[in-house]
Amino acid sequence: MDISPLRGYYAAHTPTLMGERGGSAVLVPLVRQDGEYCLLYEIRSANVRQPGEVCFPGGKREAGETAIQCALRETWEELGIPESAVTVIGEMDFIHIRAGSLLRPVLGEVDPATLAAMRPAPEEVAGTFLLPLRELKAHPPEVYLYRQPVEAPDFPY
């Protein structure tokens, strides 16, 4: 057996997460409002998957796009907040979501003056709201463990 094709392939190969299908990014938007930091959430419109879901602005990464570029682009498309109004603090830990892709959150501070001019895209966003961080700190998350058997094709060896 000739393994030269393997040698050629792996000479230029960059390892990635096996099984990752695409990828997405969200902006975790911090806004200083009335002297305290808040998170800016959006409510998904009835026209998209998971209608009524509360989420951060974000979506699928385009080819060659970084998580930061994606998060900023999606924030502009969904909320009308320009890139220039967001100070990126950094990328947060990412998660492998059930859909089979990596979700990469980007923490950023949004200029509060931008909120008055914010124009959510009605086809994607039903509404927005601010939640003070103190509210989240006052209510620790409840964690529920859900186990479901996964049936996968068997490997015969």
Q: Residues of each region from the PLM?
A:
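N-terminal leader/linker segments that precede catalytic domains of diphosphate-processing enzymes
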Residues: 1-55, 60-117, 125, 134, ...
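A short secondary-structure junction signal
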Residues: 116-121, 139-143
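A conserved hydrophobic position in a structured secondary element of the catalytic/binding core
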Residues: 131
